[in-house]
């Protein structure tokens, strides 16, 4: 039975991958999660925030395109290495057992070749920048590789993910300024770190039952019934860092209006999410693309109307 037929049998609509891509490349597109762009958005937003705060309007579209390209391919590489390390675990989890490496649609060796290709394409686009930016991008890769292993050794893999996924805030600064400017990059990095702890803890609640059986650790299992208390504090850290960052660079008042809207979105997530419902956890997780977009818009408008 084809993947498209399987999805229809389960009542799911086939993604654009099944509709438009040749059969031979579909497993690789699924391995990179190309039909689920939320991960690319979450990796891209810290870079977009940094670029929006620094770039002149004329170069902004080009810079966003470059870092958007980087985010898609590096996120894809992250998904590939995650699935490579987790292929035996994924077979035991209902939500992940059909992934290409777990199901056997892609062999481990071919998965590693696909990983190398994605890294080459993702890092190659940054070659046009200064040596510091390229070096930071290369240093980032071991963090991408190590993240899947953190789930085996600590209940805080989400914190490690925060370190890794916030990297774009540093890259945006180094690409445009030639250095990591603390007043610009650090508040954005810290806010993204705490934001990651919020949304990925919510995400981890989708699989907490299967994860506990498989021996996979997460903040969802660590916090348990106290999850909302923990992620409320993380949310305060996120908004606090964004507030401080705005003050440091003396951004315009409209930024704070958008920050208030983003705060409302984050409060809505935290206080309405049903942590016992994998479906609701998934929806709240995906809604974070809008949190990132609101902050990005606020930075732009705050710069235009100081």
UniProtKB/Swiss-Prot annotation:
Record carries keyword Hydrolase: no
Q: Which UniProt keywords apply?
A: Endoplasmic reticulum, Magnesium, Membrane, Transferase, Transmembrane, Transmembrane helix
CDD domains named among the record's database cross-references: PT_UbiA_COQ2 (cd13959)
Please give the tissue specificity annotation from the record for this chain: Expressed only in roots.
Name the GO terms of the biological process aspect. isoprenoid biosynthetic process; ubiquinone biosynthetic process
Q: Where in the cell is it found?
A: Endoplasmic reticulum membrane
Q: Which cysteines are joined by disulfide bonds?
A: none
Transmembrane regions listed in the UniProt entry: 38-58, 61-81, 119-139, 153-173, 178-198, 229-249, 251-271, 285-305
Keyword Membrane attached = yes
Question: InterPro entries attached here?
Answer: HB_polyprenyltransferase-like (IPR006370), Prenyltransferase (IPR039653), UbiA_prenyltransferase (IPR000537), UbiA_prenylTrfase_CS (IPR030470), UbiA_sf (IPR044878)
Q: What is its EC number?
A: 2.5.1.93
Membrane topology classification: Multi-pass membrane protein
Q: What induces it?
A: Up-regulated in the dark and by methyl jasmonate or oligogalacturonide. Down-regulated in the light and by ammonium or 2,4-dichlorophenoxyacetic acid (2,4-D).
Annotated catalysed reactions: 4-hydroxybenzoate + (2E)-geranyl diphosphate = 3-geranyl-4-hydroxybenzoate + diphosphate
- Which Pfam families does this entry report, sorted A to Z? UbiA
Cofactor(s) needed = Mg(2+)
- What general EC class does the enzyme of this chain belong to? transferase
User: What Gene Ontology terms describe what this protein does at the molecular function level?
Assistant: 4-hydroxybenzoate geranyltransferase activity; prenyltransferase activity
- Share the domain note from the entry: The N-terminus (1-130) is determinant for the chain length specificity. Region I (76-96) and region III (201-229) are involved in the recognition of both substrates in a coordinated manner.
What family does this belong to? Belongs to the UbiA prenyltransferase family.
What does this protein's UniProt record list under function?
A: Prenyltransferase involved in the biosynthesis of shikonin, a naphthoquinone secondary metabolite. Could accept only geranyl diphosphate and not dimethylallyl diphosphate, farnesyl diphosphate, or geranylgeranyl diphosphate as substrate.
Quote the protein name from its UniProt record: 4-hydroxybenzoate geranyltransferase 2
Q: Which gene encodes it?
A: PGT-2
């Amino acid at each position: 039975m084809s993947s498209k037929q399987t999805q229809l049998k389960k009542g799911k609509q086939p993604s654009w991958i099944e509709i438009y891509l040749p059969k031979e490349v579909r497993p690789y597109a699924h391995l990179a999660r190309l039909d689920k762009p939320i991960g690319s958005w979450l990796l891209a937003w810290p870079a977009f925030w940094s670029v929006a705060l620094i770039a002149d309007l004329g170069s902004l579209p080009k810079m966003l395109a470059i870092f958007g390209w980087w985010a898609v391919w590096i996120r894809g590489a992250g998904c590939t290495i995650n699935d490579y390390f987790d292929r035996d675990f994924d077979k035991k989890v209902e939500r992940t057992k059909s992934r290409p490496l777990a199901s056997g649609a892609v062999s481990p060796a071919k998965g590693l070749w696909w990983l190398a290709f994605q890294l080459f394409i993702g890092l190659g686009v940054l070659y046009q920048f200064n040596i510091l930016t390229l070096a930071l991008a290369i240093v980032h890769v071991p963090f991408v590789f190590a993240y899947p292993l953190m789930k085996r050794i600590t209940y805080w893999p989400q914190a490690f993910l925060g370190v890794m996924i916030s990297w774009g805030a540093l890259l945006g600064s180094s690409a445009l300024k030639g250095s990591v400017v603390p007043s610009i990059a650090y508040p954005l990095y810290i806010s993204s770190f705490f934001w990651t702890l919020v949304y990925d803890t919510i995400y981890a609640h989708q699989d907490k039952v299967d994860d506990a059986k498989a021996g996979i650790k997460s903040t969802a299992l660590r916090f348990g019934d106290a999850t909302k208390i923990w992620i409320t504090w993380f949310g305060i850290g996120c908004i606090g860092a964004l507030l401080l960052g705005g003050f440091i660079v003396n951004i315009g008042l409209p930024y704070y209006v958008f920050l208030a809207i983003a705060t409302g979105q984050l409060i809505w997530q935290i206080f309405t999410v049903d942590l016992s419902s994998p479906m609701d956890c998934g929806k709240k997780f995906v809604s974070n693309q809008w949190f990132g977009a609101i902050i990005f818009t606020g930075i732009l408008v705050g710069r235009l109307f100081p």
